[in-house]
């Protein structure tokens, strides 16, 4: 398995590292013989920051000093020589290629050579095809703009060498094509005359269930040994972002689960904490995973991240603290077993290879098995559990879109949405060729809730309350339940979404989150006391945004997913 491979690699590395002192004299002679050869092959690099030796064998250097790289080790610590002829280990994140002609600016040729050096293999270990899709080049540009800040933080020692700007956050910022609200929409067939993943079942009087190649439940357990950033940055959120990935492309929405963190166990992150009332869906570690991609290299990409603010400048940012790719099928196409997986994290971005999250952990692992075991225990890791589905879960998941990742605690609400979509688009539409605007507030606004988890929680708690008052016979009546759901939605979500009292949703801003939750909680309490939203809607205190037709209108052609061949 992957873990064994990693252990073997570590053993090799540590054997190389073992007995350093005894070998040093022989090495010295060998290096003198090879000096001229190294001179020819090695490149000059310029330091982007000051570095002070952390232990014997490291090379101290100052910013803008020119260093000759003698050997590039895969653990991120390179052997370098300074102008005085002193040699030692340096962290690769502190240097960049030096171009004599242009001073510090590196030539394009050098850059591309560097890219090949770190990027010729993907998370799955396959060769990378040259990325041409425009969103990827935009992401690379955005990440390269952030790299300067991250370099500064790394140089200051504020973050470990393997941290990077978050790749998945950048994709989410690009537009809506990696958001759950996009994947929740139906997709047309290539002919554009029918829906590919939304069909009517006349026998049951609702939408037809659809199997998917990948359909299971995954539980995020915990993250261990995650290195801490320094005190110069304040962490606003710790989270895991996950998506379907084929080693090259993101093939689903990017789902985010926020971790719970306690200062008494600073290197451990946990999920699904015990809370009074309902567990917020943002903290729910139980996720459903659906994908119908036929790629043989299909898997889940996990990226651990932090949202931070720099104390000195007030600048905000998103960092990746490591990533791991779990392939879902073996070489012969058989799905991996449902069990708990202990996944060791990689540093860098998913398009780099051989970068450690924190190289200082394993760079001096000695040869003994005990040392290796200790080193393995100190490696950053993510624990996840793949669950096999019982019949009820399988039936529920098959009512969802073919490709979607989301929180298990919202699944019943997503199914209501899909069933209402089926009623409106398949059962009640006057003509299947009609693409007129449809008046339906639920269809028009529900996808927004997927980008505002606190609003989804408001709907969940209102629905749970309503459901608790229903008789058993009513709960079995699908049409009655749907009608009740529509009532709850109009009472709870519609007024809140357009209230001026509700500040816009902002990720990882504590004051905004608290202010929003107060408005939501007060409104739900009022509804409970008054038996509905009418009083709140008519109250002079409830100020609403000017009415916009989009609150009511479902634009079929505007909302459907574009068929990407």
Swiss-Prot record:
Keywords: Cell junction, Cell projection, Cilium, Cilium biogenesis/degradation, Coiled coil, Cytoplasm, Cytoskeleton, Differentiation, Phosphoprotein, SH3 domain, Spermatogenesis, Tight junction. InterPro entries: NPHP1, NPHP1_SH3, SH3-like_dom_sf, SH3_domain. The modification Phosphoserine is found at residue 14. The modification Phosphotyrosine is found at residues 182, 554. Residues 40-100 form the SH3 domain. One of its GO terms (biological process) is cell differentiation. Residues 1-32, 104-118 have a biased composition (Acidic residues). Expressed in renal cells (at protein level). It is found in: Cell junction; Cell junction, Adherens junction; Cell projection, Cilium; Cytoplasm, Cytoskeleton, Cilium axoneme. It holds the Pfam family SH3_1. Residues 2-48 form a coiled coil. Residues 1-46, 95-132 are annotated as: Disordered. One of its GO terms (cellular component) is adherens junction. Interacts with Crk-associated substrate BCAR1, NPHP4, PTK2B/PYK2 and tensin. Interacts with INVS and NPHP3. Interacts with AHI1 and TNK2. Interacts with NPHP4 in a complex containing NPHP1, NPHP4 and RPGRIP1L/NPHP8. Interacts with IQCB1; the interaction likely requires additional interactors. Interacts with KIF7. Interacts with ANKS3. Interacts with SPATA7. Interacts with FLNA. Belongs to the nephrocystin-1 family. The SH3 domain mediates the stable interaction with Cas. Together with BCAR1 it may play a role in the control of epithelial cell polarity. Involved in the organization of apical junctions in kidney cells together with NPHP4 and RPGRIP1L/NPHP8. Does not seem to be strictly required for ciliogenesis. Seems to help to recruit PTK2B/PYK2 to cell matrix adhesions, thereby initiating phosphorylation of PTK2B/PYK2 and PTK2B/PYK2-dependent signaling. May play a role in the regulation of intraflagellar transport (IFT) during cilia assembly. Required for normal retina development. This is Nephrocystin-1. It comes from Canis lupus familiaris. The lineage of its organism: Eukaryota, Metazoa, Chordata, Craniata, Vertebrata. The gene is NPHP1.
